[in-house]
Design a protein with these regions (language model features):
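Positively charged n-region of N-terminal signal peptides that target proteins for export
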Residues: 1-9
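Intrinsically disordered, low-complexity terminal regions enriched in Ser/Thr/Gln/Glu/Pro/Gly/Ala
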Residues: 8, 17-18
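A residue-level marker of the well-folded mature domains of exported/periplasmic proteins
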Residues: 13, 20-333
């Protein structure tokens, strides 16, 4: 009998949706594309529009760096806006970029229900639409999506969790947990990937697996969830979080409680690298699943140019592989 225990805890803050991607396996051949929107143009003639989730997140800032690097290298004009993780604002940004004369537009579809109508409307006006980090399953007009293989990232996190237990002799009745965010598809995929691994060891290692709750992308909420979990499960051995903000909050709770619980996060933002390498925090925040947002930004821009110039994309879905960061490969610029 599974010991999956859901803690229903109140959340005091609600933020908008964060990054979300897919876990589909990309096709082996580039799909046929419609006629490009800017026939006869070269890369240097193009004006391309981009809508980030929020510059408050280091992840999106790195995506923007990749976009701007592609702009400098290829010569197109990049107009980069942000949606503050709000679908209604994302829709307004799309309309602004259409009016501004962009040859193609790409966005992180953090709220598909709210922003898909604007995506479809822009496509109907002849502006090719692309997506990065998070796409929409509610329309088929998106020419190309570039994002992280989030399910595989969850698998990496699950494997790291089990390895920690094995390396530290905690394979007989340990308690492990997860802080989730079951709204963005990316975080759902990460959670499912993690469970696919740890559930295989539940009976073998007599694990107690605890779902700490939904942190809603907010570090303060994550701290509260972790505080409550440590009261109920003071011997918690390890947790996995679906985003680094959850680790930031959980770290504070673990230190305050004097717990020996360790954490494995997801994103590998700069604060994760710093914590992993820190003499004290690194004893708790031991690893993180890394994405490559710079590459995501560069690749989506590259495919937008390709589509506008000759009507092709590398693939309709391009997934960037995640990897584990720990003390052996973490770095601080």
């Amino acid at each position: 009998m599974k010991k999956l225990i859901a803690l229903l805890l109140a959340c005091v803050m609600v933020l908008g949706l964060v990054a979300c991607g897919g876990n589909e396996t990309p096709a082996t051949e580039a799909p046929a594309a419609d006629a490009p929107a800017a026939e006869g143009k070269t890369a240097a003639d193009l004006k391309l529009g981009f809508v980030l989730g929020s510059r408050e997140h280091a992840f999106y800032c790195s995506i923007e760096e990749g976009i701007l690097a592609a702009s400098e290298e290829m010569g197109f004009e990049a107009v980069v806006l942000e949606s503050d993780l709000d679908g209604a604002i994302a829709s307004e940004r799309i309309e602004t970029l259409v009016v501004d004369g962009c040859d193609a537009i790409s966005l992180s579809v953090n709220d598909p229900t709210a922003s898909t109508p604007a995506i479809v409307a822009a496509d109907a006006e002849g502006v090719p639409m692309f997506a990065f980090d998070c796409t929409s399953s509610e329309t088929d007009v998106i020419k190309c999506f570039v994002g992280t293989d989030n399910y595989q990232g969850g698998v990496v996190g699950g494997e790291a969790t089990i390895k920690y237990l094995e390396d530290n002799g905690l394979t007989d009745g340990a308690t492990i947990g997860i802080i989730g965010y079951p709204e963005p598809q990316s975080c759902i995929d990460r959670e499912n990937g993690w469970f696919s691994v740890v559930n295989e060891y539940e009976e073998k290692y007599n694990l107690t697996i605890v779902n700490l709750g939904n942190y809603k992308g907010d570090a303060t909420t994550a701290e509260s969830l972790m505080n409550d979990a440590l009261i109920s499960y003071p011997d918690m051995a390890a947790i996995f979080t679906v985003g680094d903000p959850a680790c930031v909050g959980a770290l504070a709770a673990i230190k305050s409680a004097g717990s020996s619980c360790v954490m494995i996060g997801f994103d590998a933002n700069p604060e994760a690298h710093e914590a992993i390498l820190d003499a004290e925090n690194g004893k708790i925040w031991i690893a993180d699943v890394a994405q490559d947002p710079y590459q995501i930004g560069y690749l989506i821009a590259q495919n937008m140019v390709s589509y506008c110039v000759d009507g092709t994309v590398t693939d309709s879905t391009i997934l960037v592989s995640p990897y584990l960061v720990d003390a052996s490969n973490a770095s601080v610029d």
